[in-house]
């Protein structure tokens, strides 16, 4: 059987419907439904979003503490606070199985090399939370034996203020870490060398609530605080 290929002429008259004309109709409602139900972007963006969702909802903490802030951190793992809502109830005894570590307490100079080695044993991706005034800036221990902030030797992702912070503050810091992880862009495969990690710019909670603090007119007495 022989075939003959012919080019379609869009301006040619329609033999089946002589009166009909070809027109491109733009339906805003149809286009809106298409954009809502059909993904028109890059597949990489979908994969990054799905992987970041899994990472931020299955954060396994490394179990160790330095001082009294560790007591408040462990309180957050009890039933009244239910940290399992955030997927962080699986406490690991080995840094090789943990996703993030919480520096809870006073970091002495003798402990700094140990903490740094534990951090290096963690697998990528990994994150660090600095919990309490002593871990953030040395606290009231402005002496030679205390490191004035764990960010002197570790990359800190979230700072939790307080002396010591309440368990609710730890949960808020965990939520901020989840928000930051959701906006990260990491390579989707094993990469040797520089991993090209792009971290999200997290706004300062202090600056965000500055107008709210200034607007307060009725201050509580020291006996009620």
From Swiss-Prot:
Residues 202-225 are annotated as: Disordered. One of its GO terms (biological process) is electron transport coupled proton transport. GO terms for molecular function: 4 iron, 4 sulfur cluster binding; iron ion binding; NADH dehydrogenase (ubiquinone) activity; NADH:ubiquinone reductase (non-electrogenic) activity; quinone binding. Residues 204-213 have a biased composition (Basic and acidic residues). GO terms for cellular component: plasma membrane; respiratory chain complex I. It is found in: Cell inner membrane. Disulfide bonds: none annotated. Pfam families: Oxidored_q6. NDH-1 is composed of 13 different subunits. Subunits NuoB, CD, E, F, and G constitute the peripheral sector of the complex. NDH-1 shuttles electrons from NADH, via FMN and iron-sulfur (Fe-S) centers, to quinones in the respiratory chain. The immediate electron acceptor for the enzyme in this species is believed to be ubiquinone. Couples the redox reaction to proton translocation (for every two electrons transferred, four hydrogen ions are translocated across the cytoplasmic membrane), and thus conserves the redox energy in a proton gradient. This is NADH-quinone oxidoreductase subunit B. It comes from Ectopseudomonas mendocina (strain ymp).
